[in-house]
């Protein structure tokens, strides 16, 4: 799939959405914080909003071109859309909601046949029920099925997991993956959920304040953020200004206050950098670290322990604020307490340097 979004200019309440990007992957995540303009961009692709300037092309079909006045109606775009509120009809049964989305005609792709769709999403037992009697996860699957029954060329998903609790999210993600693999339909998925983006998307477009901050393969964006804003969005718990004092054999020595770290040298020549470290890449050790391949071994003191579900966020003073994410059993085995001295270990490739 090729989706070209060019010369997009849409004034919003607090900023102007301004986008120029082309996506070619099967599943692309529009990723970023709430209120960044992600849903507005999705609405433009669906034809639900008009912009003073926009050129939108899906493969070889121009859907919107404000320069020529072309605007293909929403119903003729060949797009399935699952909005965040799902937009199911509460006065209709599940079957009636599904039939509302069915595409008629002899040229329907067998992949999108009614029986096949409800089988893949496992909603046959729900067919006769009222949508008001469904759980959040069941409603999500019905909304996905209705969008697929329109036999779309592109599927738009707006925060498909946002309204679900963690157990339900874990149940819905496999269905989204099944849609990706079974129907092989291009998907554009708006999300601010890291797990959702990492699990489903081939490419990520990071948007903040109405602008594209970075776009590219998912792992590349998550592992090599282009700037501090992207680093925060993709989950770099530690983000500190530093200075490169030496580069040798592809390794950079970085100084943060009086603390020295070894990292992979950035491709761009820069001395002033932001040091980005994920919490899960920081290991903790009670005794002083013995000889190992880990280059960064920092004496630190525990400032706070903050439980986060199955994990504990450990706030450290290592000469600079450093954050570690460890499991609850790991925290218990180390008998961690506030004020304790600890050694933090960070492998060289886990320290990402972003020019500032």
Question: Residue spans of the language-model regions?
Answer:
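ABC ATPase nucleotide-binding domains
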Residues: 84, 93-229
